[in-house]
Design a protein with these regions (language model features):
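Conserved "right-hand" nucleotidyltransferase catalytic core of DNA-directed polymerases
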Residues: 1-7, 14-188, 192, 271, ...
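Helical catalytic core of nucleic-acid polymerases
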Residues: 11-17, 151-276, 282-283, 300
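Short, solvent-exposed helix-helix connector turns and helix-capping sites enriched
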Residues: 22, 125, 200, 231, ...
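Generic detector of well-ordered secondary structure
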Residues: 36-39, 244, 275, 318
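Surface-exposed polar/charged interaction patches
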Residues: 92, 123, 138-141, 218, ...
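C-terminal, non-catalytic extensions of nucleic-acid polymerases
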Residues: 107, 118, 146, 152, ...
Length: 501
């Protein structure tokens, strides 16, 4: 949250405070803690400029769901909303006691994957028929995985029980007057497959899918509204509910546990992606696959062929009921399937419309590691606006964006070693340390899990502790360190691209 001070309770909670000095320390900590809580509250209300939370009223979501379904979910974390709402609504719909429903499960020691093939599956190509044959003769145990790969139309499709992935070589790919990067994805893939196939946990019966289908229809209807009219709180809320059901179907502790449901969902998604890719190539033989994801495909093709792909999508929607959304990119910077930048065709520097994934993400959620935000900032400027990384890094004024985070557990010990008047000074670290790489300073050392073996953090570089903010015209930042971090990623993309010629 870029707090000025990062503090922990200065004393163990179980000791008595006996001096005025200790009282002042505790009061200072409490004041900082209240300020942090207020900042986090503002974020949950969407009252922040931080992009991950701006305009996303998470408390409003819970209030809206509470009013609509008469179920108080204000104190539930995101991951519990789907399961808890479904439990309450299902129990209410079927007039059952929640505690009885909680105990329900469908146990199976193994799954014959042939059972998971959708009734609308219509694979034609030799490559994907080999994949289908493998599915039809494979049995997996509840703790086993299923993985295989298929080379189709010049790209490798990697299939696993968790989804489908594929990616072209690292590089920079651009649209022009003749060709365009066309991105397509299935709206709410896993929930939509469940609805398409009428899936429900056997022990819960068909009443389950009625409730589930209602969530799907409401979310899709909301997303179809003009952007200014969409209720993003409801869209995000229904997303949590829908995705939560799929996730919980694979957890033995959940009342929705049934592995056949999980596998029918994922195998159905994989076979849809295979059918989709086949139909695309059949319609436009010279298209180029850029990426394949669990719920979508990104291609490059002639602008004059777009309507042919749209016809393919419309036909597949008729056959499967899965609805497909599309977008156009002017440029993609790809490191791999999980790390890329997509620039939408309507994006401008004044009104950016850019998708950032993996190492290119600038704003992560508060519970994630936001170290070295300057690196993705510089990478975006470099790849999208042709601004040298040195210009971004050396002219950037927000010191927080250069900071890194070190977290250590309770059984480990962290120290900062520096030289003061020709003597080594050892500063004990708290469990969370904020710092940046500097030209002068000290070294970070961690003794893990009570051992005497020390591990050096950012070995070979000096660091400056920054748990407490201070203003300076010259923070003595080691800009070279951050530039090298950027170059590591740039070289993965540009060097490999040059080797293609």
């Amino acid at each position: 949250m870029q707090m000025e001070n990062i503090e922990e309770m200065p004393f163990n909670h179980r000791i008595w405070i006996t001096t005025n000095e200790q009282i002042e320390q505790v009061l200072s900590y409490n004041k900082n803690d209240v300020m942090a809580t207020k900042l986090f509250l503002d974020a949950t209300l969407g009252l922040t400029e931080y992009s991950q939370y701006k305009g996303k009223n998470k408390m409003g979501l819970r209030t809206a769901l509470t009013k609509k379904f008469n179920v108080d979910c204000h104190n539930w974390p995101d991951v519990r909303i789907g399961e808890q709402l479904m439990l309450t609504l299902y129990s209410r719909e079927t007039d059952q006691n929640q505690w009885d429903v909680r105990k329900l499960r469908t146990e199976r020691s193994s799954i014959l994957l042939k059972e998971c093939v959708p009734n609308w599956c219509n694979i034609k190509s030799k490559e994907f028929n080999n994949f289908l044959e493998l599915i039809n003769k494979t049995t997996v145990g509840k703790d086993e995985d299923f993985q295989t790969s298929v080379i189709f139309h010049g790209i490798r499709f990697d299939f696993g029980l968790g989804g489908t992935h594929g990616c072209i070589k690292p590089g920079i790919y651009e649209s022009d007057k003749e060709y365009v990067i066309y991105d397509l994805d299935v709206s709410s893939l896993y929930p939509s497959i469940a609805k398409s196939l009428g899936l429900y946990p056997k022990h819960l019966g068909p009443d389950f899918i009625k409730l589930y289908g209602d969530f799907i229809e409401r979310r899709i209807a909301e997303k179809k509204k003009p952007k200014a009219e969409r209720d993003m709180v409801l869209i995000e809320g229904y997303k949590l509910i829908l995705n939560g059901v799929y996730g919980k179907s694979g957890e033995e502790t959940s009342f929705m546990y049934v592995l056949l449901y999980t596998y029918k969902t994922t195998i159905g998604g994989q076979l849809f992606i295979a059918m989709w890719a086949e139909r695309m190539v059949e319609a436009v033989s010279d298209l180029e696959f850029l990426q394949i994801n669990t719920d979508g495909i990104t291609i490059k093709l002639k602008r004059t062929d777009i309507d042919k792909i749209k016809e393919v999508c419309n036909q597949l929607t008729k056959e499967t009921t899965l609805e497909i959304e599309d977008a156009y990119y002017s440029k993609m910077i790809i490191r791999d399937v999980n790390n890329y930048i997509s620039v939408y065709e309507d994006s401008t520097k004044e009104n950016e419309h850019i998708k950032l994934k993996g190492v290119f993400v600038e704003d992560v959620e508060y519970h994630q590691n936001s170290s070295m935000k300057i690196v993705p900032i510089a990478l975006k400027n470099y790849f999208v606006y042709n601004i040298p990384i040195e210009d971004t890094i050396r002219n950037h004024k927000n010191i927080y964006d250069f900071c890194l985070r070190l977290k250590i557990n309770g059984s480990s010990k962290g120290e900062w070693h520096s030289i003061e008047k020709d003597n080594i000074k050892i500063t004990q670290l708290t469990r969370t340390t904020r710092y940046f790489i500097s030209k002068k300073g000290g070294g970070l050392i961690v003794y893990y899990n009570g051992s005497n073996s020390a591990g050096r953090i950012n070995k070979g570089f000096n660091t400056t502790l920054f748990n407490r903010y201070y203003k300076s015209d010259n923070y003595d930042i080691n800009f070279n360190f951050y530039e090298v971090e950027c170059r590591k990623i740039i070289n993965m993309i540009e060097d490999k691209q040059l080797k293609l010629f």
